[in-house]
Amino acid sequence: MIKNIFFIMFFLTSLTLKVNAACDDLPEDGVVYSGCAFADSQDLSSSYLPNADMTFVSFIGVIFNKSIMLNSRMDNSQFPESSWVRSNLYESSMQNSNFEDSDFTSANLHKVSFRGSSLLNVNFSKALMTEVDLTGANIQGAVFDQTLLGNAIFPDGTKCAVDSVGECKKMK
């Protein structure tokens, strides 16, 4: 009986350690941070995080400037007041997440999905947003100065013409 209790306690402890260990892993290709809550305002500039799983995370005020995060998953997460200047987020999924008051200036957002996300007051100036999906997203107050929006889908389902820059010209 005592042996069984000891085994169960050891098993549960090892599971807990494995879950927490992922949150402490260094940024790298394919890292899994799913469900982690991080300290506010971390500077992770120039991070290499392609194929990362950052679903259900909290990263308030994080700085990911000049980071490479191709094909990463950041769905259902909290990234308000974050900075992604000149980051490469090609084909990433950022659905149903909070990016309010964030800065994506000059970021590569080609084929990124922001479906259902809160993008209030986000700066997308000079970003590459071709084929971006903003279906159901809240883009109130968002800035698109000199942003390439060819074939982007806006929140109301409008598909932008290929030559859309700074504003979505409805496809003919």
Locate predicted features.
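Sec-dependent N-terminal signal peptides
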Residues: I5-T13
